[in-house]
Design a protein with these regions (language model features):
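Amide-donor transfer/coupling interface in amidating biosynthetic enzymes
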Residues: 26-115
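Cysteine-nucleophile active-site neighborhood
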Residues: 1-38
Length: 115
C-alpha cells in the first residue's frame, strides 16, 4: 500500500533511495504545476483490464511509478502512472484501500482471498 508499492521498484527519487528491486523502474516525484498540486490528496480513478479493480480510490502521494509490464491498473494525475502492480506473488497499490470505502474493502478482501 502506497510507499509499500514503491519500495518494490529499484530506486526512489525521494532521498535518492535504493529500493528492493523486485520490479524494474523507479519512483519519481510529481511536479507541481498549474494543473496539479503535490501531494495528490483525494479520490482518483483506477483503470484496469480487470473490471473488479476499476473505480475511484483514495490517494495520498507525492511520488509515482511509470507504467511497465507489471502494471495491472493505472491512473492519471498530470500524467499516466501505475496505481496497481503485480509480479509473481507481489501485489502493490499506490492508493489507500483502507480509506477507499466499499471499493477499498473489496480490494483488500480479494487480495486476502488470493493468498
Amino acid at each position: 500500500i502506497c510507499i509499500g508499492m514503491q519500495i518494490l521498484f529499484e530506486y526512489s527519487e525521494e532521498d535518492n533511495t535504493q529500493c528492493l528491486g523486485l520490479i524494474n523502474g523507479g519512483v519519481k516525484k510529481f511536479q507541481s504545476d498549474s494543473n496539479i498540486k503535490v501531494p495528490q490528496m483525494g479520490w482518483n480513478k483506477v483503470i484496469s483490464d480487470t473490471d473488479s479493480l476499476n473505480g475511484y480510490y483514495y490517494f495520498a502521494n507525492s511520488y509515482y511509478t511509470d507504467s511497465n509490464d507489471y502494471a495491472i491498473g493505472h491512473s492519471y494525475y498530470g500524467k499516466k502512472f501505475n496505481s496497481i502492480v503485480k509480479k509473481d506473488n507481489f501485489l502493490g497499490c499506490q492508493f489507500h484501500p483502507e480509506k477507499s470505502s466499499d471499493i477499498g474493502e473489496k480490494f483488500i478482501k480479494n487480495f486476502i482471498n488470493t493468498i
